[in-house]
A protein has these predicted regions:
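N-terminal secretory signal peptides that target proteins for export/translocation
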Residues: 1-13
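Glycan-recognition and catalytic cores of secretory/periplasmic carbohydrate-active enzymes
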Residues: 31-531
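Sequence-pattern detector for short linear motifs
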Residues: 8-9, 17, 117, 289
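Hydrophobic alpha-helical segments and their boundary regions
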Residues: 12-14, 40-41
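Generic N-terminal simple sequence motifs
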Residues: 11-12, 23, 69, 516
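Bacterial N-terminal signal peptides
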Residues: 14-27
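Generic structural signal for short, solvent-exposed loop/turn connectors between secondary structure elements
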Residues: 4, 25, 217-221
Length: 531
């Protein structure tokens, strides 16, 4: 923790001064953050509410405004249409509102939930009644598509309706059902916190209750279902939103059952139990989602058997397997560094972490989703420790490998984010070297949308009688400390173009409070001023 102390500058503040410095019953959780650690027993830093912070001007305010005016609306139109694929229409078909067949990737449901999460996060800042009405219309259809037992996956439901005997719940890991439901749970929590409504939260709870029953005693076959494990983060967040311990137990089960898989793979991080892992392997999105989920479980349980591999894997990534952009996953395709048991076969990996220092520039994969997963993971590591080194990685990824995934006009996207683009290559790579409005695998664009919509949530944190300033950008904060005292701050800066940051304390209670300022890794040793 020494680095945490070195990389934060603390000041005390007290008014009157100006400080210039660089159908269901649920507890009311509206106003809390995207990852709500307000009551997490092992969180050193508490998140602030979605409605307590907003961008005001500058770099991030411009991108948030673009998300509001262009990215969310244009993507909403794409997902409600059928020109490229089917997203919302699959829900309408599953609900029996229109006739048709399922079309699109098996993870389209989850990607639609990501867009819904991003649109919901915008509501915390805009209170746009038209957007809220539109989301409620969509949520009503999602609810109608859900089976009475809580199961919700449009691809499986539509295929089962026409007699497909292979369309059964949790039969095929490549149906991505848990991934889809994980994003449903997260979207539901954000929607509830942004609006105070429980319509989507009720849908998510019914789905989670089905998962609790189904995975109460997981078999090796069920354990293989955990591909792109967003469901761990989702289940923990649902526990935080509802206070129901069974959802935390479910998240712990999702982690533990990975040790049940027979003939597991590095590609899916289930060759050995998570608690025995020491380095990042396999599909980088799946890996980073797993690490973020494990960090979420640690925040609630304090289990040292989770923290030990998290620290070891983190060190392996940032010192040997991460690009200077914060990008993760260097390989398009390859063989597992750990080899295969059968000498006549290989253990393939793709979109994956490679060997130590295997970081090609031109053929870098660095999928946008993996890079967002890196930020999600490091954010949770920071919340658990208060160590600035984790926020350094969040900032590194957000400014570079995450934002590069979208165009300046908010309508076109990258799937991969190479560090070098060669005009001539001996072979054509899988993904376009130019941004496009749509990819057959459409996971990255809505992930970027929700990340930008929720970006202000990373700026500040709280702990007892202190405010943490984690990121720099023109913003305003209006929150309360543990003793109930109100704190209002305004941050003015042209960061990252200019390193001068001015923080004004607009209001606070009668008691002094701490103000913890992260010293960016590139800025150590510079002089700070107080005025």
């Amino acid at each position: 923790m020494n680095s945490a102390r070195r990389n934060w500058q603390s000041v005390a503040a007290k008014l009157p001064v100006w400080a210039f410095l660089a159908g269901w019953a649920f507890p009311l959780c509206a106003g809390t953050g995207v990852a709500d650690t307000d009551t997490s027993a092992f969180a050193k830093v508490r998140t602030v509410g979605l409605d307590e912070v907003h961008w005001t001007r500058g770099f991030w305010a411009d991108r948030w405004a673009l998300c509001e005016t262009q990215m969310v609306p244009s993507m909403g139109r794409l997902m409600e249409g059928t020109n490229y694929s089917q997203f919302f229409r699959n829900f309408q078909i599953a609900a029996g509102l229109v006739q048709g067949a399922s079309h699109g990737a098996p993870f389209n449901d989850g990607d639609f939930y990501k867009w819904l999460e991003g649109a919901s996060a915008l509501l915390a800042g805009t209170r746009d009644p038209a957007l809220e009405r539109n989301l409620n219309r969509i949520i009503a259809v999602i609810g109608k598509a859900q089976r009475p037992d809580g199961y919700l996956d449009t691809r499986v439901e539509i295929r089962a309706r026409v007699g497909d005997t292979h369309a059964r719940p949790f039969l095929d890991p490549l149906n991505f059902e848990l991934y889809n439901l994980g994003h449903l749970m997260t979207a539901a929590c954000v929607n509830h916190r942004a609006t105070g409504q429980t319509n989507l939260l009720a849908v998510a709870c019914r789905a989670a209750d089905l998962l609790c029953r189904t995975f109460q005693h997981p078999t090796p076959a069920l354990a293989r279902d955990s591909i792109c494990p967003s469901q761990i983060m989702g289940a923990v967040e649902l526990y935080r939103a509802t206070g129901r311990p069974r959802y935390l137990k479910l998240a712990k089960t999702f982690l533990a059952m990975r040790g049940l898989v027979r003939h597991g793979t590095d590609q899916n991080q289930d060759r050995i139990p998570f608690v025995d892992q020491t380095e990042a392997v396999g599909h980088a999105v799946r890996a980073n989602y797993l690490y973020a989920g494990a960090a979420d479980v640690f925040l609630e349980t304090g289990d040292p058997n989770l923290w030990r591999p998290l620290e070891q894997i983190w060190t392996n990534v940032v010192t040997r397997k991460m690009y200077i952009t914060g990008g993760c996953g260097s390989l398009y395709d390859g063989a597992s560094p750990d080899g295969a048991k059968n000498p006549e076969a290989i253990a393939p990996v793709h979109q994956a972490y490679g060997r130590n220092y295997e970081l090609p520039n031109t053929t870098a994969y660095s999928e946008t989703c993996a890079d967002i997963g890196n930020a999600l993971w490091n954010w949770r590591m920071f919340l658990a420790t208060g160590d600035a080194k984790f926020m350094d990685v969040v900032e590194q990824a957000l400014y570079n490998s995450v934002l590069s995934g979208g165009s300046l006009d908010g309508t076109n996207y990258f799937y991969t984010n190479p560090l070098r683009v060669a005009a001539r290559r001996p072979a054509k790579l899988r993904w376009s070297r130019a941004r496009r409005p749509f990819y057959s695998s459409f996971c990255c664009p809505p992930n970027l949308v929700r990340t930008i919509a929720e970006s202000a949530d990373y700026v500040y944190g709280k702990s007892g009688d202190a405010i943490w300033v984690n990121l720099y950008g023109g913003s305003a904060l209006d929150t309360r400390l543990a003793d109930g005292g109100e704190v209002k701050l305004a941050q003015e800066t042209d960061y990252p173009w200019n390193g001068r940051v001015q923080i004004k304390i607009l209001a606070c209670g009668q008691r002094a409070f701490g103000l913890k300022l992260r010293i960016p890794r590139v800025d150590h040793g510079r002089e700070r001023s107080r005025g």
